[in-house]
Design a protein with these regions (language model features):
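Single conserved hydrophobic/aromatic residue that forms the stacking wall/gate
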Residues: 1-13
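Terminal amphipathic helices with adjacent charged low-complexity linkers/tails
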Residues: 19-23, 88-89
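Short loop/turn segments that connect beta-strands within beta-propeller blades
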Residues: 130-131, 172-173
Length: 173
């Protein structure tokens, strides 16, 4: 499972009383976390990229980076998970003291979005072999990739959601 905003693909295993953590591998560049607890799968925040009141820090992936909301898809025929990704999307966050005002944002932060590499791509589709825990292939897009993935028994994947408004078909293998 591609985590929504952490930047890691999580491998989990069903157990009698819970869903257990097995492993995690980064699928986008991330600097906000210093590690992952091998027992629980919980990330540890890197203090160099954790905001405090009045201080600004950079962090990757941004609030829009990583997988975010679009759904990934699994194809049992190929054994691959296909993840819609926004790579190269970072941000800056500054902690602020705020006074609660009904109906307004109450985050206690000012955020902005940046590109880690202005010449690089932003959107991608990544195919991951979860048995090996590694990326098998990817397709890059110059714009964000906000579309979900659909995979078929005929070993195709379909996607949309880039700013060029194309609907794409790819070989799932």
């Amino acid at each position: 499972h591609g985590s929504r905003g952490l930047g890691d693909v999580y491998k989990r295993q069903r157990q009698a009383d819970r869903i257990g953590f097995v492993d995690a591998e980064p699928y986008v560049y991330q600097n906000a976390f210093s590690g992952i607890d091998p027992e629980t799968g919980r990330p540890s925040y890197d203090p160099n990229h954790t905001p405090s009141t009045g201080d600004s820090v950079d962090f990757c992936p941004s609030l829009w980076g990583g997988k975010d909301w679009p759904p990934a898809a699994y194809n049992p025929g190929t054994g691959l998970v296909y993840i819609p990704v926004n790579e190269n999307h970072c941000g800056v966050i500054e902690g602020r003291e705020v006074t609660y005002m009904p109906g307004s944002s109450y985050t206690g932060a000012r955020t902005e979005f940046t590109l880690r590499d202005p010449e690089g791509n932003i959107g991608e589709i990544q195919a991951w072999d979860m048995n090996r825990g590694e990326e098998v292939w990817s397709v890059e897009f110059q714009s964000h990739n906000w579309g979900g993935i659909l995979t078929t028994g005929g070993n195709l994947i379909f996607s949309g959601g880039t700013s060029d408004r194309f609907f794409r078909a790819h070989d799932a293998t």
